[in-house]
Amino acid sequence: VLRNVDLAFANSLRRVVLSEIPTIAVDIVEVESNTSVLADEFICHRLGLIPLSAKGVDAVEYSRECEECESYCDNCSVVLRLDAKCTGDDIMHIYARDLVIVSQRKNEFVGTPVITDPEGKGCLIAKLRKGQEIRMKCIAKKGIAKEHAKWAPTAAVGFEYDPHNNLKHLDYWYENDAKTEWPISENATWEDPTDPSAPFDFNAKPKNFYFNIETVGTMEPDVCFQGSIKVLQQKLATIIGALQGDPAANGADGYVPQSPGRGEDPGYTTPFMPGGGGQSQWGGAGTSYGGGGTTPGFGQNGQW
């Protein structure tokens, strides 16, 4: 339950939960051998979508910001191996449990395949017949869902703010009984009952929001929500720092993703001015017709 905030803030947290919580997922796959009926890219795609534990992921650096390597290392990645060969007559099933971590991790949790089924098998990766084998090296890296959906920590995120159905959504859309077909939400226990005969206040602003977060297993829902608050705080701190002229706020705090090689560049590089700074071949922030953003035919006040 999120209380005493407005709708915009609640929706901001929802968007952050969906796309900006750091997790870890298989990003690079080196195929050494694959004689199964599945194509290399098919298996690689399945490996990328296997949930890996994000517990302690803050200790892992973003690969693009790692100063110890150019591709991957123990500081910015977790290496897993998949080695399987069918030698019997029966079909061999390859599961997420068959992924073996071979690198030195930052902690004992991050990068571990998430297995929640009672049999302890995990996601099915492929099937092999006699004589077929798969040998692959998987490099898992840190990222967010804005870059690729494989880093998404959640499958669905939603919230409601009218558990008693004061808006009466089904007044004109029901078959037999509106109350039966639109039952009161279980979240209504958090609020006092309302007068069903009272008119709906369309100017009222909701203050209580009831979140429903379904994760893919990489982290717990409460941890995911707390992480969204942290991410939103850091994003706001970056904006405030930039407005105050703090050069360290330009995404250089090791958390906000930035383009490789940008560094402290004050602006974007264009084909007309490789030196960066947001300039063009016509110079400065103005135009070829003069500074100050004016155009021919207009004066300083936008008058003819």
Which residues fall in each region the model found?
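Protein-protein interaction/assembly regions in multi-subunit complexes
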Residues: V1-W304
